[in-house]
Amino acid sequence: MEFTIKTGTPEKLKTGSVVVGVFADGQLGDAAAALDKASKGKFAAILGRGDLEDKAGSLLAIHDLPGSACERVLAVSLGKRDEFGDKAWRDALVAIGKALASGAASDVAVCLTDTPVPGRDIDWVLQQLVRAIADGAYRFDATKSKDKGKDSKRRGAGKVVLLTREITASMEAAIQRGQAIAEGMALAKDLGNLPGNFCTPSYLADTAVALGKQYKLKVEVLDRDDMEKLGMGSLLSVARGSHQPPRFIVMHYKGGKSKDKPVVLVGKGITFDSGGISLKPGAEMDEMKFDMCGAASVLGTFKAIARMALPINVVGLIPTTENMPGGGATKPGDVVTSMSGQTIEILNTDAEGRLILCDALTYAERFKPACVVDIATLTGACVVALGKIPSGLLANDDALARELLDCGTVSGDRAWQLPLWDEYQELLKSNFADMGNIGGRFAGTITAACFLARFTKAYKWAHLDIAGTAWVSGDAKGATGRPVPLLAEFLIARSQGAPG
């Protein structure tokens, strides 16, 4: 999708569609008012019929509006004026993105920057706008045969003009950021949506290597022998039941000064999670291909920051394997030794994400990081606690947690913090090892993070549990690309002088 920015008036644009915003009380912004004037009041009269619902994101297509050079005007409701803010704006953008993706117009002009969003500047507005439209155009068909029928003829907008009052360098940079983040989300979605027989640990490694070649990133891929030499007994215990060889991916983005400490991102890469010997129920087990969405988000974020050329150093660590039953698989009751030297009693083989992450978190120490953020579809308990709106956030540093929460608000990819109190550590006690890998039926998200916290004593660390936000089920089943927007916003802020 190609985005350009220009000044001008909407009624003179010869394009397939012109998008304008209106409020529930009929109040028109500058662009909508210009269309109304050119149509001699016809535009307002059509809106006055009540066909456009008041709810933010409602749409009304008006064809052949008098006085306008475009084929159709797409009016989007911004909701009630006194309730207008981030949520209403995003609701409108999501609706526009979907409409443009499925519409017949190949070229579109979007005239929405004339409506200020309270507390937000024009750069934020443009970045969000571009990201939403580009993300709305996403479709996954890598595992389908060639498109047939009418849907193949409706490929949506390929060219989008953003109409503004002025053009500045910062506005153009905001557009580029929006595109970069959308591309990172698309990569994360592609990887998440691929089935487990396509997206194996080796496939993730090959994707990282290809990304490295494209953007001149240093990428290392460690195999089973390398991991054994490092003493990654916890990670390797998960891989024992699978015929797919495990991989440990190390990525380096060096956009900052050589002396700058890196931010380390760690992504859980279970490319299919059967539960192992502690086998999951069969219902919806197909969705366990999404258990590598933490890894996908790291790869997507690396693509985004490389496209933006952020002045920051970032290391990406991706431990990746399948979790399968088999004659050689780890059994409940087995005790393994992690890279840190701490021993773990594996009480449930379906609590495997923490077992691969803990060795990656130990490996992260060698980079003397400014901070470490791990991303994982870790616990069903997080979905029970928070639903599918925010990601769960736990951290051993309150300032780091606040950064991530704030960046979640700015990006719209929100998180919610849960406690990481010492009292919960008692639930991980084991009679046969330094710790068990589960803490019982209560506070599952917290005890999982408490387990990881035992491997993060050397640095500031935060954990994002994306079990509820990495994908959606039902008719719209598929990966969401989250939390790439949150991570990208966090790294943008860090590159501009935030703590660290």
UniProtKB/Swiss-Prot annotation:
Transmembrane segments: none annotated. One of its GO terms (cellular component) is cytoplasm. It holds the Pfam family Peptidase_M17_N. Its EC number is 3.4.11.1, 3.4.11.10. The keyword Protease applies. Binds 2 manganese ions per subunit. It catalyses: Release of an N-terminal amino acid, Xaa-|-Yaa-, in which Xaa is preferably Leu, but may be other amino acids including Pro although not Arg or Lys, and Yaa may be Pro. Amino acid amides and methyl esters are also readily hydrolyzed, but rates on arylamides are exceedingly low; Release of an N-terminal amino acid, preferentially leucine, but not glutamic or aspartic acids. Signal peptide: none annotated. The active site is at K280, R354. Its cofactor is Mn(2+). It is found in: Cytoplasm. Mn(2+) 2 binds at K268, D273, D291, E352. The keyword Membrane does not apply. One of its GO terms (molecular function) is metalloaminopeptidase activity. SUPFAM superfamilies: Macro domain-like (SSF52949), Zn-dependent exopeptidases (SSF53187). NCBIfam families: PRK00913.1-2 (NF002073), PRK00913.1-4 (NF002074), PRK00913.2-4 (NF002077). HAMAP family: Cytosol_peptidase_M17. Belongs to the peptidase M17 family. PANTHER family: CYTOSOL AMINOPEPTIDASE, LEUCINE AMINOPEPTIDASE-RELATED. Presumably involved in the processing and regular turnover of intracellular proteins. Catalyzes the removal of unsubstituted N-terminal amino acids from various peptides. This is Probable cytosol aminopeptidase.
